[in-house]
């Protein structure tokens, strides 16, 4: 029956395909959670039961320093290499999040995690001792939202009672991976951002949570031809615009229906580009807008130029600042939109452009 209906037209609209799918599956199926062109509204409640943030000394000295769970004055975290230090942060964050959720890691069915390093080195070694099934993810600095999205889908779909999302970044390991060795002393342009040394972990479940994930809008890859790896904000802003506008259209909301629309690490340069791009699409989000990369450092005293970046930037800010405000009811609904620049050493050295991606998670006060 489904195959017959699908053959009727190769150019059917999204609404037509959605109707066919619902007829085939039944109105009580997971298909009925599809919203608009690329969003999902969870009918079965998904809650954040626990979260944790682990940061290095520079982040601890910033404006959000007092709110982080674990602050280490040693950027090596007692290890021998930067990569090992990043793995240690993930291990600590995941264990701390489970403790705050009053769970053993053995009760977490699936882990969704990733980082910025080749072959997800920090994640592979960081959570090996957890001994839980892992889905390794690479979404660059959007990985926090990507992991939350997939973890929420697994919980809402009944595939796991509890799932965890974890990600990290480290200034030194990222510089080593994508730019120049620290000893080289390369000068940074003002459009550059500072990779956050930090890890955030989140435990999702069907009950006993304090913030609800009510929906998600997975993002598309958007490439506007930018090639400057020292201006990540310009690379990622078009993708952020695309996802934010699609979320508003899919859920039929106005920007003011969110207390905050928060991107991950566009920084001061990307912020201005995003606000103009969104305005060109017919929305004004300036009143609600916030960026984790702008919040996490003081550029005047910490010499971070355009702001913070990295997978850890959005993750630790979500855990330390955004979730507590939602929990207290200071904010009722937040659109959380981490952004990622999808480059590698190979693609950049071959002269390729730097595409961007952004995933959106709708967070609500319980």
Describe the residue ranges of each PLM region.
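Conserved "HGTGT" condensation-loop signature of ketosynthase/thiolase-family condensing enzymes
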Residues: 1-8, 15-112, 116-135, 200-366
């Amino acid at each position: 029956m489904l195959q017959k209906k699908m053959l009727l037209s190769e150019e059917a609209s999204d609404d037509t395909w959605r109707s066919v799918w619902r007829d085939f599956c039944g109105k009580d199926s997971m298909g009925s959670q599809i919203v608009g062109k690329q969003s999902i509204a969870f009918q079965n409640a998904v809650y954040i039961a626990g979260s944790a943030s682990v940061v290095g000394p520079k982040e601890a000295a910033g404006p959000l320093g007092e709110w982080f769970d674990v602050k280490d004055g040693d950027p090596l975290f007692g290890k021998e290499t930067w990569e090992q230090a990043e793995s240690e942060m993930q291990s600590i964050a995941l264990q701390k999040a489970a403790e705050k959720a009053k769970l053993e890691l053995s009760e977490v069915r699936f882990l969704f995690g990733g980082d910025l390093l080749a072959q997800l080195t920090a994640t592979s070694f960081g959570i090996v001792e957890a001994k839980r099934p892992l889905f390794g993810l690479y979404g660059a600095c959007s990985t926090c939202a990507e992991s939350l999205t997939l973890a929420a889908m697994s919980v809402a779909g009944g595939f796991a009672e509890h799932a965890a999302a974890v990600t990290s970044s480290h200034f030194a390991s990222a510089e080593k991976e994508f730019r120049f060795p620290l000893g080289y002393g390369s000068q940074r342009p003002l459009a550059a951002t500072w990779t956050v040394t930090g890890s955030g972990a989140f435990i999702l479940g069907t009950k006993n949570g304090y913030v609800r994930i009510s929906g998600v809008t997975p993002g598309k890859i958007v490439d506007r031809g930018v090639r400057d790896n020292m201006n990540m904000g310009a690379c990622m802003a078009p993708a952020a615009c695309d996802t934010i506008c699609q979320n508003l259209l899919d859920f039929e909301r106005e920007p003011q229906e969110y207390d905050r629309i928060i991107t991950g690490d566009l920084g001061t340069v990307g912020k201005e580009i995003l606000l103009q791009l969104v305005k060109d699409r017919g929305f004004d989000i300036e009143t609600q807008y916030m960026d984790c990369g702008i919040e996490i450092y003081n550029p005047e005293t910490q010499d971070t130029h355009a702001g913070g970046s990295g997978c850890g930037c959005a993750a630790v800010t979500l855990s330390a600042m955004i979730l507590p405000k939602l929990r207290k009811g200071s904010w009722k609904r937040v659109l959380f939109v981490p952004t990622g620049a999808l480059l590698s050493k190979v693609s950049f050295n071959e002269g390729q452009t730097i595409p961007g991606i952004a995933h959106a998670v709708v967070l609500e006060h319980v």
